Amino acid sequence: MKRIILTAISAFWVLSSFAINKTTYTFAEKDGQELKLDLYMPEDTLQEHPCLVFAFGGGFKMGARDEESYQKFLTEIAENGIVGVSLDYRLGLKDKKVKNLIQLAKILEISVNMAVEDMVSAVKFVLDNATEFKVNPKQIMISGSSAGAITALQTDYFLCNGKVKELPQDFRFAGVISFAGAVASFGEKLEYKHQPAPVLFMHGTKDELVTYNKKVVLKRGMYGSNYLIENLWVKNNWPYMALRFRDFGHEVAMLGFKEQVPMVLEFIDKFVLNPSKIYVSDITIAEQGVNEPLLQLGTDGLYGDAEVIISEEVVERIK
């Protein structure tokens, strides 16, 4: 496949910056724990906005919805006219002592399922209050970093396979944004009964913590971004955009939402708000010099696949 080397990603989305109103709500109580979400709302005159629901990272054993880096990301999202939501979810691996891989697999399954349940509850809370929160119910996206990205991808996977009962039967996510995520399998065949939402995959090609390819034994394990793209999205002509960070590891879980917000906004614009017949070719992008990736007209829908090279200077900035 042809590779085109470009040099920087700069802003694609130009909107007025809005003042932001941040409010905290309790959206559920489970296992004796109050689950809260922070709502970042643009203070504008629009009655409906797209909405991005975000789950933090931390290996299902640590992390918090209101960490400074997440606040900055969601504030920037809201400044561009998108309601941002950062949620709590129960941490299934917190304080757990794992003795072997079999025990780890069982606890991980419980952890992923709990996180998905909590993300679904947060989305339902947003849907139930869509008028008050000025959210367009048809433009709700989910996102996350690392464990949160697994949660987002898994939530859409479960929804497509009829495993989500808390949301309206005809509900579909408008998009999924994954910062170093994967889909988990716990013994079943990996398949989607309904077409998934458009996905923005960001992943380091050498990520071994949340695999870029797949780590599966007897149908148990993780299917990473590259495996999902090559074996499902490409074969089924499903809409996606991929940013592959060459020779990077799991630091992309943070680099993505800290350094690549313009690409997030580009994805939302092209795939969620204004889907068209644009095909984004397989591109290698370095950090310096160009305003946007090469866009080519296509006939089969909106797809994207970019390979990103980021300088060591950027790596230092995300630490």
Where are these regions (language model features)?
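Bacterial Sec-dependent N-terminal signal peptides
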Residues: 1-22
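N-terminal cap/lid segment of alpha/beta-hydrolase-fold proteins
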Residues: 19-47
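Short beta-strand element of the alpha/beta-hydrolase
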Residues: 48-59
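Short amphipathic alpha-helix adjacent to the substrate-entry channel of hydrolases
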Residues: 65-87, 94
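Alpha/beta-hydrolase active-site loop
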Residues: 105-131
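Primarily recognizes the serine-hydrolase "nucleophile elbow" in alpha/beta-hydrolase
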Residues: 124-195
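The feature captures the conserved acid-bearing segment of alpha/beta-hydrolase catalytic domains
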Residues: 165-236
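C-terminal catalytic histidine-bearing segment of alpha/beta-hydrolase fold enzymes
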Residues: 234-319
